[in-house]
């Protein structure tokens, strides 16, 4: 490690220590006490940022060298001619090639007439668990009739 890298590491350790010495304010108190603690915490944080900028100033603009190199590389790019598209039409085998995951899928069958119209049908002879409904039970879909009776 050369001297520049050691100085940089030392500065970064100092910045890390400075940030650790200013934790976010915690604790009970009235709203104005909490507000004042947050205000002082923010002021200390701004002072730490000012010190950090003095310890390790960031460059104002990126160096010119890498940008010029990138521009030169972009200028050297060449668009090549694309090959001619294929003239033959696809064969029947290519159109029937189905990925293996789709090959195993089986379409759902339509529900039988004894099961009603679908999942939410009230005319079904079975409830959601699959056991037959009791004959004494009222149809739970006719809630308006139940409300007018009661």
UniProtKB/Swiss-Prot annotation:
What job does this protein perform?
Escorts unspliced or incompletely spliced viral pre-mRNAs (late transcripts) out of the nucleus of infected cells. These pre-mRNAs carry a recognition sequence called Rev responsive element (RRE) located in the env gene, that is not present in fully spliced viral mRNAs (early transcripts). This function is essential since most viral proteins are translated from unspliced or partially spliced pre-mRNAs which cannot exit the nucleus by the pathway used by fully processed cellular mRNAs.
Q: Region Disordered: what ranges?
A: 19-39, 102-150
**Motif Nuclear localization signal and RNA-binding (RRE): positions:** 33-47
Task: Please report the name of this protein according to its UniProt entry.
Answer: Protein Rev
Against Gene3D superfamilies, the record matches this protein to: 6.10.140.630
Q: Which locations, inside or outside the cell, does it occupy?
A: Host nucleus, Host nucleolus; Host cytoplasm
Ranges of Basic and acidic residues compositional bias?
135-150
GO MF terms here are: DNA-binding transcription factor activity; RNA binding
Biased segments, Polar residues type:
20-33, 107-116
Region named Homomultimerization: 14-22
Record's GO cellular component terms: host cell cytoplasm; host cell nucleolus
Record comment regarding domains: The RNA-binding motif binds to the RRE, a stem-and-loop structure present in incompletely spliced viral pre-mRNAs. This region also contains the NLS which mediates nuclear localization. These overlapping functions prevent Rev bound to RRE from undesirable return to the nucleus. When Rev binds the RRE, the NLS becomes masked while the NES remains accessible.
For this protein, the record's Pfam families field holds: REV
Per the annotation, the residue ranges of the short sequence motif Nuclear export signal and binding to XPO1 are: 69-80
> What broad taxonomic lineage does this protein's source fall under?
Viruses, Riboviria, Pararnavirae, Artverviricota, Revtraviricetes
């Amino acid at each position: 490690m050369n001297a520049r890298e050691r100085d940089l590491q030392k500065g970064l350790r100092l910045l890390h220590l400075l940030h650790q010495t200013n934790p976010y304010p915690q604790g009970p108190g009235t709203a104005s006490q909490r507000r004042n603690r947050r205000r002082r915490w923010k002021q200390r944080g701004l002072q730490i940022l000012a010190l950090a900028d003095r310890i390790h100033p960031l460059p104002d603009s990126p160096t010119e060298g890498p940008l010029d190199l990138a521009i030169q590389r972009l200028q050297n790019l060449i668009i090549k001619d694309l090959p001619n598209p294929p003239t033959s039409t696809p064969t029947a085998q290519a159109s029937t090639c189905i990925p293996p995951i789709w090959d195993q899928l089986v379409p759902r069958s339509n529900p039988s007439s004894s099961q009603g119209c679908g999942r939410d049908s009230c005319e079904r002879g079975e409830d959601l668990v699959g056991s037959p409904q009791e004959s004494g039970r009222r149809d739970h879909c006719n809630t308006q009739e139940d409300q007018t009776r009661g």
